[in-house]
Every structure is written in structure tokens, then in C-alpha cells.
UniProtKB/Swiss-Prot annotation:
The lineage of its organism: Eukaryota, Metazoa, Ecdysozoa, Arthropoda, Hexapoda. Pfam families: Lipocalin. Serine protease. Activates thrombin by cleavage of prothrombin. Does not activate factor X. When injected into rats, causes thrombus formation, fibrinogen depletion, uncoagulable blood, decreased platelet count, inhibition of collagen-induced platelet aggregation, leukocyte infiltration in lungs, congestion and hemorrhage in renal glomeruli and necrosis in renal distal tubules. Its main location: secreted. This is Lopap. Residues 1-16 form the signal peptide. One of its GO terms (molecular function) is peptidase activator activity. It is an enzyme of class 3 (hydrolase). Its EC number is 3.4.21.-. Activated by calcium ions. Inhibited by EDTA, activity is recovered by the addition of calcium ions, but not magnesium or zinc ions. Inhibited by PMSF. GO terms for cellular component: cytoplasm; extracellular region. Disulfide bonds join 24-131, 58-187. Larval bristle.
Length: 201
């Protein structure tokens, strides 16, 4: 489901997700995060695999400001159909950092989960991060997304992203990344509809 998988992945998990021994790593979100500067369209360049994925590609998300929060519309293309979810992205109370909460409507369900932005320049790239601890098994599930304002990262942004990933190589195994297809064929769709099937627990 590509970028659409971002919204499903952080809300549900099965064996295909990246699950690692130990607790979630101690990551730092972007300080003094500017919600208004983050608005607009982002394209998913690559990410860790998502268990909820089907055969979707051409993933993107649009953030629209609304009274201090960001409305969300995230979609992907699958079998010539654009499938999308809607929701809101809000800052957590008591912090100016990019420690965010994502709420997504799926059918009659509203799913809520953390989503941190751990690096961005607002104009070219962003790195989204989510982690869930499984205390009983002493493991954690990690999701990370490399995002761009365009369907390809420019060289400067690519260098910045690669530096971040190198600095966090213990937390993020780069061999786990899968890339998004933005070819004309992958992005072609005849109709669109909202995702309504419940998922997760």
C-alpha cells in the first residue's frame, strides 16, 4: 500500500512488519516543529515493509491546515483504483516538537497512533517514524518513511537522508527498505474510493 501503508502500518501489525528485539530506540523528534510549513503534499520514496500492504503504488499524502491541526488525505493506487483514508494529524500537548498523533477514520472505526517527524527541511524531504513496544515479548515494531515534496529526492536531500540513516544504522537496517513505484503505469487509476475495511486490533 506504499504511503497509504503509513496510516495502516502504525495502527496494526502482523508478522510481515519489521519487529526487533528490545524496546523502542530513544529517538528525538524535530524541535519547534512548524505545522503550517509541513502542510501540502508529500510523496513516499521508500519505507520499511508494511504487513497491511497489498499491491498498491504511487503513494502520497496531502495535509490541509484546519484550526491548529492538519487534515489528512492519504492514498495509493491499486488495480487502477485510488484508495484513500482521511483523518487528522495533531501535536501532542505540552511539546513544541514533532511528536504527533495521527487519527484515521476507517469505516466505523477511528484509529489513533503516534507519528514522529525525526528530520525535515519542510521544502524538500521529511522522515516519518513510528514505534510500538511489545513488552511481553521484549520486542518492538518499527516503521520509517522517507518522504519528498516531489516523486524523486534531489541529490542534496538524498545526502541528508543518507547521513541520518547512517547515524542511526543501529536503529534502522537499511536493507529493510522497499521503494515506491511512481511510474505512469503505477499511478494510473480510473476511479477512487475511501478505504472502509476495519483492520488491526
Amino acid at each position: 500500500m506504499k504511503f497509504f501503508g503509513l496510516f495502516l502500518a502504525i495502527l496494526a501489525s502482523t508478522a510481515a512488519d519489521v519487529v526487533i528485539d528490545g524496546a523502542c530506540p530513544d529517538m528525538k523528534a524535530v524541535s519547534k516543529f512548524d505545522m503550517n510549513a509541513y502542510q501540502g503534499t508529500w510523496y513516499e520514496i521508500k519505507k520499511f515493509p508494511v504487513a497491511n500492504e497489498a499491491n498498491g503504488d504511487c503513494g502520497s499524502v496531502e495535509y490541509t491546515p484546519d484550526n491548529g491541526l492538519l487534515k489528512v488525505r492519504a492514498g495509493h493506487v491499486e488495480d487502477d483504483i485510488e484508495k484513500f483514508v482521511v483523518g487528522v494529524l495533531t501535536k501532542n500537548a505540552g511539546t513544541s516538537d514533532a511528536e504527533l498523533t495521527l487519527s484515521v477514520v476507517v469505516g466505523d472505526y477511528v484509529r489513533v497512533a503516534p507519528l514522529w517527524i525525526v528530520s525535515t527541511d519542510y521544502d524538500n524531504y521529511a522522515i516519518g517514524y513510528s514505534c510500538k513496544d511489545y513488552k511481553k515479548s521484549n520486542q518492538h515494531r518499527v516503521n520509517i518513511w522517507i518522504l519528498s515534496r516531489t516523486k524523486t529526492l534531489n541529490e542534496s536531500s538524498k545526502s541528508t537522508v543518507n547521513k541520518f540513516l547512517k547515524e542511526h544504522s543501529k536503529e534502522f537496517d537499511q536493507s529493510k527498505f522497499v521503494e515506491t513505484d511512481f511510474s505512469e503505469k503505477a499511478c494510473f487509476f480510473k476511479k477512487s474510493h475511501v478505504y472502509t475495511v476495519p483492520f488491526g486490533a
